[in-house]
Amino acid sequence: SEIIRFFVLFSFDIVLIPNAFTPNGDGINDSFYIQRISLYPQNTLQIFTRQGQLIYQANGYKNQWQGIGTDGMKVPQGFYYYILTLKKAKETKEGWLYINY
């Protein structure tokens, strides 16, 4: 008889980035919450409008963004582009997110 072995690898250090959040003050999903971002304290997050205007930037992001732009006002409902750079992983993640109030 033959023995077959399977190995399953789990990675618990992968950040999970949502594609939407609702910063409406109800206490649910009010910030752009990136799971496991605390494993990468040396990170940079940039958020842009669809036209390419930078509206938010943080070095050492800690899930604090609640849809407030650089002007101190709530950004309009809609799609935004993010760039998250993780120094430790030497990786950049990019994508779209939707803000809904």
Where are these regions (language model features)?
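Short loop/turn motifs at secondary-structure boundaries
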Residues: R5-Y101
